[in-house]
């Protein structure tokens, strides 16, 4: 259960949940993290009356969720898990977008089997007529391309509640194709809802081969522009075909981004026990080949994967790196962070303290260590999945915009190392919104591609703006790179009218025309 930091306020002890698990632990205290999100959403609400737990409990009861002050405290401290219905009621009472809080638990619950079903989705009765009727409606919406993110999430819940449901092969294929092709265009809340749907569908044995086929077909398109998101589903699919695809991504990646995705997927599948002995052997050979080709780069790029390998192989590689003077690999493998703990803690604390001061409401709790912990994980954790989940949690909290403000301020400091600045930029991509548009544009020509690329992608997650659209179009270069590909991403995701002109142009470079045509076939971003 989550540790809690307390302070006395209005005659009661207010508990702020904290995940006390070690940074390098294989699992986190999900209940504490959800409890923190609940309490911060309430305590930083614009209605000051909600800071009184008794008032808020009464508001939940008025909205149809009978709740005591004691139960509220236990939810928010992480002592007991909250039901999905109660989280949805939190959202209604606080006036938050539907899914702002609950989609996080649906997302996490779909990827962590130990999470109780009642936390991850609403209560469903697969034996009832209403369930069957609604399932039919959701399938029709999805097959016809009319399903919104909320519909997909609900479809995922229904299929996970009835994993033995019989559907025609053509129906499974249509659902898989639609999910795989739509997922790369989702952002923010829609991303969490679509992803939760995909993860739940992946739990259905009958669906797994269709999902792998859809991913393989999608990735085989020579003009494909976004590969990480749909390919990321492979770690949920314990099939031989999925394992082979992951190993291919590590061995023969089309670019550095694909390689990084492959390393993450291989590490995840290794941890889940998805590889056969023969696949283990192939993975070992790939790692050794990469190591011999460039030991210095391999010790950096493969740290996440090496950390999860059997002790013999892991120890051999760490020893070799240490003997060659590259001690960082041993530290990263042992401690779970890419930089020294004191440095990670200091930077995260600095950012969290600044961000908290920027949030308008100032509830009187003494200390919140969870935000610091989440910022630290999002920026510096060795494991991609852990960083990703921490970033999503911050983005759903009242601190997302403020943390992005502070990150952008720190990013402007050129004294930071390029690696640190790339991590700052990556987290900004998760958290930025319309208020950050001009500052994102200011980094369009940053000298480091790993910095400007995620920031340009962040522009693509915002609605179309004539200003940024013209600036991005004018800055397009002739030669393909990750940064230039990101500019096409930004134009396409925002629905730029210039995309059609690029596709038709006889003067535009071939890679731009190919990218524009691919995006025309996909469509712009999905926010709902």
PLM features: residue spans?
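Short juxta-domain linker segments that transition from a proline/glycine-rich
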Residues: 109-212, 225-231, 242, 463-464, ...
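Extended alpha-solenoid helical-repeat scaffolds
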Residues: 192-200, 209-232, 241-264, 278-289, ...
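Short alpha-helical DNA-recognition segment
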Residues: 47-74
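Structural detector for internal amphipathic alpha-helices that build alpha-solenoid repeat scaffolds
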Residues: 153-167, 189-206, 227-237, 259-274, ...
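Amphipathic alpha-helical scaffolding segments comprising HEAT/armadillo-like alpha-solenoid repeats
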Residues: 169-184, 206-218, 239-251, 272-290, ...
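A short, Lys/Arg-rich alpha-helix, primarily the initiator
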Residues: 1-54
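Short inter-helical turns and helix N-cap capping residues of alpha-solenoid HEAT/ARM repeat scaffolds
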Residues: 187-188, 219-223, 251-258, 290-295, ...
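DNA major-groove recognition helix of helix-turn-helix/homeodomain DNA-binding modules
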Residues: 79, 83-101
């Amino acid at each position: 259960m989550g540790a809690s930091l307390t302070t006395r306020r209005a005659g009661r002890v207010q508990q702020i949940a904290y995940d006390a698990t070690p940074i390098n632990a294989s699992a986190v205290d999900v209940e504490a993290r959800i409890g923190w999100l609940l309490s911060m959403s309430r305590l930083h609400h614009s209605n000051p009356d909600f800071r009184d737990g008794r008032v808020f409990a009464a508001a939940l009861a008025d909205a149809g969720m009978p709740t005591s002050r004691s139960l509220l405290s236990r939810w928010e401290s992480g002592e007991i898990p909250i039901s999905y219905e109660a989280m949805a009621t939190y959202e209604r009472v606080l006036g938050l977008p539907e899914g702002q809080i609950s989609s996080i638990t649906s997302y996490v619950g779909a990827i962590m089997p130990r999470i109780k079903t009642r936390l991850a989705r609403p209560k469903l009765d697969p034996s009832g007529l209403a369930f069957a009727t609604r399932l039919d409606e959701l399938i029709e919406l999805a097959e016809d391309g009319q399903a919104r993110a909320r519909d997909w999430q609900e479809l995922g819940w229904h299929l996970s509640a009835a994993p033995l449901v019989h559907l025609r092969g053509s129906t499974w294929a249509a659902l898989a194709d639609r999910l795989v092709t739509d997922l790369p265009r989702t952002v923010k809340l829609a991303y969490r809802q679509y992803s939760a749907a995909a993860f739940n569908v992946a739990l259905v044995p009958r669906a797994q081969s269709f999902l792998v086929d859809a991913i393989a077909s999608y990735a085989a398109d020579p003009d494909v522009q976004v590969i990480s998101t749909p390919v990321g589903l492979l770690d949920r699919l314990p099939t031989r075909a999925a394992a082979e695809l992951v190993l291919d991504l590590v061995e023969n990646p089309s670019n550095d981004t694909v390689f990084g995705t492959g390393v993450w997927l291989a590490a995840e599948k290794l941890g889940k026990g998805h590889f056969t002995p023969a696949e283990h052997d192939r993975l070992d050979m790939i790692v050794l080949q990469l190591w011999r080709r460039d030991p210095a780069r391999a010790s950096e790029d493969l740290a996440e994967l090496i950390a999860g390998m059997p002790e013999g192989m892991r120890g051999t590689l760490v020893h070799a790196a240490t003997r060659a003077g590259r001690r960082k690999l041993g530290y990263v493998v042992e401690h779970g962070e890419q930089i020294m703990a004191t440095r990670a803690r200091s930077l995260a604390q600095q950012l969290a303290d600044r961000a908290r001061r920027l949030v308008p409401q100032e509830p009187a709790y003494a200390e919140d260590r969870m935000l610091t912990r989440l910022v630290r994980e999002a920026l510096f954790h060795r494991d991609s999945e852990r960083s990703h989940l921490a970033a999503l949690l911050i983005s759903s909290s009242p601190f997302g915009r403020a943390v992005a403000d502070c990150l952008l301020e720190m990013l402007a400091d050129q004294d930071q190392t390029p690696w640190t600045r790339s991590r700052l930029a990556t987290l900004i991509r998760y958290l930025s919104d319309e208020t950050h548009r001009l500052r994102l544009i200011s980094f369009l020509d940053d000298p480091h591609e790993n910095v400007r690329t995620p920031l340009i992608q962040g522009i693509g997650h915002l609605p179309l703006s004539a200003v940024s659209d013209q600036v991005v179009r004018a800055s397009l270069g002739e030669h393909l790179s990750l940064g230039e590909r990101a500019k096409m991403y930004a134009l396409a995701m925002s629905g730029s009218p210039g995309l059609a002109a690029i596709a038709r142009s006889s003067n535009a470079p071939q890679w731009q025309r190919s990218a524009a045509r691919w995006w025309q076939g996909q469509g712009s971003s999905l926010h709902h």
